[in-house]
């Protein structure tokens, strides 16, 4: 009888202990998520400046052999790692536009010339302007396929209106 009473009391104490630890651990875990009050703004010589004006010296111990990985990406290209240190991220890559070759310059000039001749044909509605504009549009490179189709549609719209003799 005494043994059963002691066993039941130990079980109740254990159950109470388990519930209190789970409640406490979930309360602690909920604090880590959500918006952060302090966000790093700049890093200079291992000193991190936060947006509220405070500073913190950061160091990664030499004996820390845990692999380093990115935990969070902040504004201003600042990375926070799993060990609590901060670094600037990699600089963004900018693709420089390729220098235009003579061939591409000539193709662009043909496109511009075709646009000018189509504009002139829209104003005059003459047969000679139509021939010049149609020839120029036909000579436009296939690389400007969409613009070429637009120019051809403009010519067709003028032809629907009729030519002036």
UniProtKB/Swiss-Prot annotation:
Organism: Staphylococcus aureus (strain MSSA476)
Keyword Secreted: yes
Signal listed as a keyword: yes
Cleavable signal peptide: 1-29
Major place of residence: secreted
Highest classification ranks of the organism: Bacteria, Bacillati, Bacillota, Bacilli, Bacillales
Name of the protein described by the UniProt record: Fibrinogen-binding protein
Domain of life: Bacteria
UniProt xrefs under Gene3D superfamilies: Sbi, C3 binding domain IV
Residue ranges the record marks as coiled coil: none
Listed InterPro entries: Efb_C_sf, Extracellular_fibrinogen-bd_C, Sbi_C3_db_domIV
Compartment(s): Secreted
